[in-house]
């Protein structure tokens, strides 16, 4: 299990949002720390194949992630900073909807959804409408949906944004629990989000990595 960034750059005109990033990651939790505008989200969107790098390569076990296509996306779980959901769906129905998008068979999806909702402390809220949930609850459902396909790579972009201190602690504990046997990349501008759970912390500033 190895993820490699090789001279990865994303340029918008003369601005380098990500600037020649080179790094290797294996199993564990990696904290990507930086202020808003440092390039974290751009890097994560490339990692999730939402946008292409201007130059450089991102490799999974030695193969370019963009050439791997659907097989790569099948081992990827992603929680964006602002993820969309249908407010009138129940928590359970939302999970089943995402499971169908990810191609899970209904019998597998049902078991997986119920297990994950239990794991994130949302089983008792599974019949509640998404629009009735607090910010912390929405983030917990968010990480549950990202885990539906049992991903090898879990990407969390500013997962504690807008949460109170108690919810941040709960979320950190959850990330630690879910990190076994997978690679977790967690981006944040809050030091405490990563200092207790990350195996390695990388500072990102003006599109570059600092160690």
Protein language model features and the residues they cover:
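Conserved ABC transporter NBD signature motif
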Residues: 56-67, 71-72
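Catalytic Walker B motif of ABC-type/P-loop ATPase nucleotide-binding domains
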Residues: 154-157
